[in-house]
């Protein structure tokens, strides 16, 4: 039951984190700025998450994990409330930064807690359950939030997320046990884990995967509008992606436990890279009446492959010793959001220099690079804490 409440909180965080892609045109119109400039809301959030997560983990290292999760979720809710009343783009940017601090503290801790209370043979599924909160958010929260933003204004979407966060907070207050173990790793040990060659390869793989995905996802509404998609159609496309992501997430957890982490991650990356590259092919060469259907099919394949990778990658890191794995998971989340930040920047550059039809192949090349790195490196080594810290 405790893991379920963690998933509910992840649902609130995932809804806010991904719904912004559907709100960019609405916010751009309201703030009277370009969609590319508005896209930096994604970059600011992701960069704050990437840098803030490990720093906050060290700052609150001696705090009970239950209290840490509650503190993080309160910060996330406060950021959404700030967005509701934001009267300018800089204030909205600041609110996204506050949200990211809360999310960056919450998600790695939640995954670590889920692993700590799960049996060894079910750890992959425990990770998948927590991360499924984020992927289910792409199924329900993102398309619904996008529709609400289009009909009632983007502020209404942030208000909805604040309510979701409050509901999750209530569940954690009453459903999460106390006495969860604290992290005992020092700053030196954390840096030692980050410097370990096997972990660095894993983090680079995650960052490349995330960069490729967000290069396309951040500005997905732009090529879709070019094909004649209206607000309802774009919400439908986001729903298709969300359903596929949820399926991929669960498949990633199950296959990791059955056939292994690296084969599962490799299959996910290959599927994702191919689907992204084919999006560009469809946009450039397919007739518009066919491109609409083809794009939806490719978005579905992309969602399955892309989100099968992440639980497999996380489960691979869990094979490390307990203290190391918790640090590695936090670093992996930072690598993912660093990739998200780079994807937001890359997507904006592609739109400005090339065009919407080029987003897919550039994003796909980044994911393909992640696959090449994964296959080159193979299985992670399992270092000892004393060895890498000493």
Language model segments and positions:
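Intracellular juxtamembrane helix-capping segments at the cytosolic ends
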Residues: 105-118, 307-321
């Amino acid at each position: 039951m405790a893991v379920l409440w963690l998933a509910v909180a992840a649902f609130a965080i995932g809804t806010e984190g991904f719904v912004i892609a559907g709100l960019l045109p609405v916010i751009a119109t309201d703030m009277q700025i370009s969609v590319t400039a508005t896209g930096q809301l994604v970059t600011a959030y992701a960069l704050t998450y990437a840098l803030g997560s490990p720093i906050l983990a060290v700052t609150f290292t001696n705090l009970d994990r239950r209290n840490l999760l509650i503190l993080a979720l309160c910060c996330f809710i406060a950021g959404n409330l700030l967005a509701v009343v934001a009267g300018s783009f800089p204030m909205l940017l600041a609110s996204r930064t506050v949200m990211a601090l809360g999310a960056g503290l919450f998600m790695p801790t939640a995954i670590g807690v889920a692993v700590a209370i799960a049996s060894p043979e079910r750890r992959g599924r425990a990770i998948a359950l927590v991360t499924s909160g984020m992927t289910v958010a792409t199924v329900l929260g993102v398309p619904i939030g996008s529709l609400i933003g289009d009909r009632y204004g983007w502020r209404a979407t942030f208000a909805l997320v604040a309510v979701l966060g409050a509901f999750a907070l209530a569940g954690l207050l009453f459903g999460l046990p106390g006495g969860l173990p604290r992290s005992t790793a020092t700053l030196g040990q954390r840096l030692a884990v980050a410097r370990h060659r096997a972990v660095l390869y894993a983090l680079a793989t995650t960052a490349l995967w995330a960069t490729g995905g967000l290069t396309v996802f951040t500005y997905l509404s732009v090529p879709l509008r070019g094909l004649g998609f209206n607000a309802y159609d774009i919400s439908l496309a986001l729903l298709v992606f969300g359903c596929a992501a949820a399926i991929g997430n669960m498949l990633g957890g199950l296959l990791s436990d059955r056939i292994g982490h690296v084969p599962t991650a490799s299959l996910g990356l290959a599927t994702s890279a191919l689907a992204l590259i084919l999006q560009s092919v469809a946009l450039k060469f397919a007739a518009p009446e066919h491109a609409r259907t083809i794009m939806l099919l490719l978005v579905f394949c992309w969602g399955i492959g892309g989100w099968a990778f992440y639980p497999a990658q996380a489960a691979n890191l869990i094979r490390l010793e307990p203290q190391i794995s918790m640090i590695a998971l936090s670093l992996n989340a930072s690598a993912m959001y660093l990739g998200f930040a780079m994807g937001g920047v890359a997507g904006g550059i592609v739109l400005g220099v090339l065009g919407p039809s080029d987003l897919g192949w550039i994003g796909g090349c980044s994911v393909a690079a992640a696959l090449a790195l994964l296959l080159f490196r193979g299985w992670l080594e399992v270092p000892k804490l004393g060895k890498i810290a000493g």
